Amino acid sequence: MNEITWSSYLLDSAVSYGGWRTRNADGGFGSGYNVTVQNALARSLNTIPARIVINMIGINESYNYLVNKYHITTAVEASDKSAAPLSIGSMTYGTTSLEMTAAYAAFGNGGYYYKPYSFYYIEDANGKVLIDNRENKGEQILSTGTAEVMRHLLMTVTTSSYGTGSSYKTSGFDTFAKTGTTDDNNDKWFVGGTPYYVAAVWYGYDIPEYISTWGNPAGAVHKTVFDAIHEDLPDKDFEDLDGAVQKEYCTDTGKLASSSCYSTAYGWYKKDNVPEYCTGHYYSSSSDDDDEEEEEKKPTQSSPPSTSAAAAGNNGGEE
């Protein structure tokens, strides 16, 4: 689907589906401003994914990806084939950290899903192989370009000053991540990956109750564990697989920057889904992204924004 890009502007306002209406984590129905896809993801806004699922991708295609591509087995078609479960994750029975880890791994490995396993291979005393996962073949569920763009998008969750995972980046390594909080603040999630490992952490109670801890304890656990296991590992970067390209874009329109654009930033795009060049500034009076732009003014892979994000904070976002 070549409609959505890093710098696509979408309206941060509630959309409805059946009897459900989107709210952001602050309880509000959105700012009423246009925001980029990247900005919405880093801040964990609910309105933007709901708008994408309902109006752009569609319920059927979204459910197909959830079940048949990402292999989430807990989905219940009768109740989860709907806007809220597919856009913000409010599934009937939730999901597991194992399946979340396997799904998110595709964003860091070029788009491949690998069925999780606990043992590489096991031999008995006579050398007979009892369990063998050495030839575990991956299934390509995303194009290389889509996976690369998603990885760069998710990296801004930890590198942007307004990102909900900015406190939980693995020390010394690029980290793509996504945070999550359920209704009534009963559950906290953090899924994060480096060039070496991917892991999902869930934090909550056996019998759900309000989590009063400040911040995201799941993110804190992830960072503690990942900092420890990466401490003695050699430097390693994510492999760029030539499916995506970094481009300068106009922060007023979301289109590729031209010589007349006075405010620009850098984003990542699939090579076959690059916006056209900007010929005017159509969003300058209706966008709140000007003071919270995504990437540094020079092209770098995971650097924080150069323009001020102080006004944004987590305004309307998840946490």
Describe the residue ranges of each PLM region.
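Extended, charge-rich, low-hydrophobicity segments
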Residues: 20, 38-39, 50-51, 64, ...
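Active/ligand-binding-proximal structured segments within catalytic/core domains
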Residues: 1
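A penicillin-recognizing enzyme superfamily signal
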Residues: 5-6, 39, 94-271, 275-281
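Glycine- and acidic
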Residues: 46-48, 82-88, 135-136, 206-210
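Mid-domain, small-residue-enriched loop/turn segments at the edges of structured enzyme/sensor domains
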Residues: 21-28, 56-101
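Ser/Thr/Gly/Pro-rich low-complexity, disordered linker/stalk segments of secreted
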Residues: 280-319
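Soluble periplasmic/extracytoplasmic beta-strand elements of cell-envelope proteins
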Residues: 9-11, 87, 200-202
